[in-house]
Amino acid sequence: MDKIEVRGARTHNLKNINLVIPRDKLIVVTGLSGSGKSSLAFDTLYAEGQRRYVESLSAYARQFLSLMEKPDVDHIEGLSPAISIEQKSTSHNPRSTVGTITEIHDYLRLLFARVGEPRCPDHDVPLAAQTVSQMVDNVLSQPEGKRLMLLAPIIKERKGEHTKTLENLASQGYIRARIDGEVCDLSDPPKLELQKKHTIEVVVDRFKVRDDLTQRLAESFETALELSGGTAVVADMDDPKAEELLFSANFACPICGYSMRELEPRLFSFNNPAGACPTCDGLGVQQYFDPDRVIQNPELSLAGGAIRGWDRRNFYYFQMLKSLADHYKFDVEAPWGSLSANVHKVVLYGSGKENIEFKYMNDRGDTSIRRHPFEGVLHNMERRYKETESSAVREELAKFISNRPCASCEGTRLRREARHVYVENTPLPAISDMSIGHAMEFFNNLKLAGQRAKIAEKILKEIGDRLKFLVNVGLNYLTLSRSAETLSGGEAQRIRLASQIGAGLVGVMYVLDEPSIGLHQRDNERLLGTLIHLRDLGNTVIVVEHDEDAIRAADHVIDIGPGAGVHGGEVVAEGPLEAIMAVPESLTGQYMSGKRKIEVPKKRVPANPEKVLKLTGARGNNLKDVTLTLPVGLFTCITGVSGSGKSTLINDTLFPIAQRQLNGATIAEPAPYRDIQGLEHFDKVIDIDQSPIGRTPRSNPATYTGVFTPVRELFAGVPESRARGYTPGRFSFNVRGGRCEACQGDGVIKVEMHFLPDIYVPCDQCKGKRYNRETLEIKYKGKTIHEVLDMTIEEAREFFDAVPALARKLQTLMDVGLTYIRLGQSATTLSGGEAQRVKLARELSKRGTGQTLYILDEPTTGLHFADIQQLLDVLHKLRDQGNTIVVIEHNLDVIKTADWIVDLGPEGGSGGGEILVSGTPETVAECEASHTARFLKPML
C-alpha cells in the first residue's frame, strides 16, 4: 500500500469526495477558512485511523479512551494508526512545566539521582561516605615525614562539665584529648565551665607519614570511627593553623553531621512529597492578600471606599476604623495616600499586641465598649477566606489575592535537600531556569569522569536529543521551568510535535493543525525541516496549513473549496504545487502563482505626533525596561521573533492597564511598568481573540451578535402572535414557553453509550426543530423561527433586507467573510478564526465612537490568503472610523499593510525584550538588527 484511498467522504460539509493520498509524504491541506479542511484531515482521516486502532482493543480498555465518532464516509483504505497534534493549549494544571511535558525533567531527575553530588546546604561541603581504605590512602598521600594525629570527635559544641565522659575515656586507656582546640592530658583534664559549649576529640593515634603504616592506620581509623559514630579528623601536629582533613563513614556533612537519604529520582520531583518544597507543596508560588489589590485607589479616603467593604456604607467595619482613628489620631476622611506609613501598617496588618478601645453600636443604638487588639484588614480577609463556607464570599475575597514566589524555595518548587545536589557544580534548579538553547549548550559541554560518565551516557543522550528537537521547532527561548499554563497554543503544539519526534515512531499518520502559528518567518524553516524529518522516518504527515512556505515545501497539496461552508467541501485541485497553480478555480493556486496578491497600500495614514499612547518602563517577564509609543488612530503591528516579548508587552501589560483605567476592571493585573500616558484618547479597550464565543450548543452567532433579539421581536409582532398573546420570549429556545420541553430547546437528546462515544439523536417530539408545535405555527414572510435559524448569513441578509437594523448587523457578518455559517449554528462547531470574525462583526455593527482601542493577537490564525484580504478590509475600516488597532502578527501580508510597526527582539527569551525599531514599514525594513526587516524588505 503506497496510498490512502478515500471514497465518499461526507463529514460536515464535505460533498461526497473521493481522494487518493500518497503515503509517507508531506501533504498540505489548504483552502478558505471553513471550507472543510479540518473536516477532511481531523474528522475523517484522523478519526477513522484512531477509531480503527482503538476498535482492536478489548471492550474493557475502550471505556477509558475517548472514542471518536465514526465519520460519514463510504470507504477508506491504507490508513495507519493516527496521531493528531492540535492547537488546543496545554493543560491548566499549575504543576505542569515545559520540562515535565517533554519528559526532560524525568531524565534530569534520573541524572541527578545517579551521578549527582549532594552537598551540605550550610557549609557547601560534599557529603560522601568513605571507606576505611579510602581514608588510609588519603592520609598516606600526604608529604612523607609529616607529623599528624588522628582524632575521634566525641562531643560537638555541647554545654556541660562532661566529667563523666572524660573519666570514661581515661579508663579505656586513652592518654590525650583535644578539648576546645587545646591538646591536654586525660590523667589531669582541665575543669570545664558548665554554661559554655565545648568540643572534645580523643587522640587515637599519633604518627609520621610513611609507606609501611597501612595496617596500623586502618586499625586506628576503625577505632576512631567506632568511638565517634562514624567521623574522624586528621590534624597537623606542627602547624595548628593547617587545614584539617575530615573523614566520614556516614553519608553526612563532616562539619555539622547534616545527612540525607540515598539519592533517588523522586527526591527531584516537585510533584512528589519526597521532593516538593513543604511550604508551597511544589507549586513554587504562595498566595497572599495583596495590599495593592486591596487599596486600588489611594486618592480615596477610608470613609470614601479606599478599602472595599470597609467604607461608611458598611456600618460594622467602619465603626472599627473610626475607633482605630481615634486611638491613632488620624482622619478617616483624609485620602489614604496622605496617611502616614505607620497608619497604613496598623490598618492593613493590625495593631499587634496593643489594645485599642472599640465602640460597638447594635441595631437598637446601644453602644458597648470593648478593648482588644485590631487584627488588620489583610489578616481579617485571610481569616474569612479560610473559615468561610460560602463560595460567594470566597470568590469576592479571591479578587484581592496575588501570587508571589515561595520564600522557602525561591520559586524552584523543590525541597532544600534536592536544591543542594550538584552535577558538575550546577544544581537542578539552575538547569531548569536555563533557556532550552542554553541548556543544550550546557549538556554538550558536560564532561563527567570515569564511572559516572558511563552511568550518565544514555541519560545524557536522551536529554540532548529532546533539547535538540525543541530547538528545531523554534522553542530555544523557553525555559524548562516555565509553567505550561503560560504557553500559547502554537508553543504547546510545537512542544507536542517535538515529543513526537523524540518518540521516533515509523509508519504513523500524523495530522497537524497549523503548526506555524506564532512562529516568526525565521523559525519557519526549522519547523518545516522537522516535518520533513518526520516524513523521512517513514511517516505520512498531513498538515492543515495556510503558510506559503509550507505549501511550497509540500510533496502533495490538496486544495479544498471553492468557497467556505455550504459553498465548499469539494476538492478543487490536488497534486504537486505546479498542478495547483495550473487550476484557474483554485484560489490557493492563484495566490501562489502571484496572479492574485494582497497589495501594499498606496498611501499610509501618517502618525500625528501630538496624539500618542506612551507606556514607559515595562519590565514583565523578559522585557528590559522598554518604552512603547503607539500613534493614536493608526493600524499598528507588533512584530518580533517568537519569545521576544510581544505578548508580555501587549496582552500582559498594555491590555490590563487599559482595562483597569478605561473599562473599570478591578481584577486585571498588569505586569510591572512605570507610567502610562495618552489613555484619555480612548473610551474603551476591546481584546478580540480566538477563544470560542460560547462553550454550549445554545450559544450561536445570532445570539452573540444580537441579531436574535430583533428577529424574535419581528415574530412576536406578526398578527397571529398578537392574537395569541405571544411575547418575544415565546421564540427563545432557552426559556420555557415556546421551546420543546422534551429536549429543552436543544433539538437533540444526548444518549450515553458505554464503550462507544455518546451519541446525540434528534429529539423525536420536535424532530430537531427546538420549538413546540404552537410556536412553529407562527410564520414571518412564510418562514417559521426554526427555518430562519437554519438560514445561512447570506440568505438571511436577503430575507431581512427590508429591516435596516437586522440588515446592518448581517451585512457586517458578510463583510468579515462569514457568508456561509448558519444563524443558529452551535458556537461549539465554529473554528477559532470563525469565532474571532463573529466578534469582529459584533464590533463593526456597533455605532462606533471612533475612540476604541482594539487589541488582536494573531488574527490571521486559520485564515487563507483570501480571508486575510477580507480581515484587512475590516480592520482598515475600523481604523478609518478613528479607532486605534494594535495587532500582534507574524504574517507579512498583514505587516506590510500596517501604518506603523513596533519590532521587538533581537532574539527570543532572555536574548529579547527590547524594542529594536518602530516606524512605518519602510523605516523598519531598513533596520539591520531586525529579523523581521530581512523578510519584510522584499515584500515592499
Swiss-Prot record:
Domain annotation ABC transporter: ranges: 310-587, 607-937
Main site of residence? cytoplasm
Could you say which residue ranges form the zinc fingers (C4-type)?
A: 253-280, 740-766
Q: Name one GO cellular component term.
A: DNA repair complex
InterPro entries, sorted = ABC_transporter-like_ATP-bd (IPR003439), ABC_transporter-like_CS (IPR017871), ATP_grasp_subdomain_1 (IPR013815), P-loop_NTPase (IPR027417), UvrA (IPR004602), UvrA_DNA-bd (IPR041552), UvrA_inter (IPR041102)
Q: Extract the Pfam families matched here.
A: ABC_tran, UvrA_DNA-bind, UvrA_inter
Q: What does this protein do?
A: The UvrABC repair system catalyzes the recognition and processing of DNA lesions. UvrA is an ATPase and a DNA-binding protein. A damage recognition complex composed of 2 UvrA and 2 UvrB subunits scans DNA for abnormalities. When the presence of a lesion has been verified by UvrB, the UvrA molecules dissociate.
Anything further noted?
A: Binds about 2 zinc atoms/molecule.
Q: How does it assemble?
A: Forms a heterotetramer with UvrB during the search for lesions. Interacts with TRCF (Mfd). UvrB and TRCF binding to UvrA could be mutually exclusive.
Full protein name:
UvrABC system protein A
Query: Which organism was this protein described from?
Result: Escherichia coli (strain K12)
